[in-house]
Regions:
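Acetyl-CoA-dependent GNAT
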Residues: 7-88, 93-94, 106-108, 112, ...
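Active-site acidic-Proline motif in GNAT/NAT acetyltransferases
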Residues: 93-99, 127-128
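C-terminal "cap" of GNAT-fold acetyltransferases
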Residues: 2, 7, 11, 119-164
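Charged, low-complexity surface patches
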Residues: 17, 102, 125
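Residues forming the Rossmann-fold NAD(P)(H) cofactor-binding site
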Residues: 99, 103, 107
Length: 164
């Protein structure tokens, strides 16, 4: 059996941006919560929006040409941490889980944040996202006080220092 081909791409064509919208919607659907408090619909319409380079990053993971996962990065001007950014929308489709793709996406976004010159990367996650929380801990993230209002019960706020 041949080894699957893995690519990380920045969506730049209308077709790839539409593929990004679809996987973001799939991500939101699996959360089972309303992301309206994050202006999710406006985010979808405006892609790449805040995730555009040079201050942001938007990644799709393709396995044998099929969209398997995504992750994004944006500047975070409202945090109590100087020169901070935020990781958003880390998601791997079920068929592609348990192969380390989530880790690769997260590490690629961490590298993009370092290259962009950020000092801190923050994210929020939910209590029931156990695999993601274990990954974040393994990558050196630590729990911090809330850096924005999230009305969803069980939200956790994490930070990693990029200069460490």
């Amino acid at each position: 059996m041949p080894t699957p081909s893995l690519q990380f791409i920045t969506p730049h064509t209308p077709e790839l941006l539409q593929a990004t919208r679809l996987i973001f919607q799939e991500y939101a659907g699996q959360l089972g919560i309303d992301l309206g408090f994050q202006d999710f619909d406006a985010e979808l319409v405006g892609l790449p929006g805040d995730y555009a380079a040079p201050q942001g990053a938007l990644l799709l993971a393709l396995v044998d040409g099929e969209v398997a996962g995504c992750c994004a990065l944006r500047a975070l001007h409202s945090a109590d941490y100087p020169n901070a950014c935020e990781m958003k929308r880390l998601f791997v489709r079920k068929a592609f889980r348990r192969f380390g793709l989530g880790r690769q996406l997260a590490e690629t976004i961490l590298d993009a944040a370092r290259i962009a010159g950020y000092s801190h990367l923050l994210l929020d996650t939910l209590s029931d996202m156990e695999s993601a929380r274990a990954l974040y801990e393994d990558l050196g993230f630590e729990e911090v006080p809330p850096y924005y209002h999230n009305p969803i019960a069980g939200a956790h706020y994490l930070k990693v220092d990029l200069n460490a």
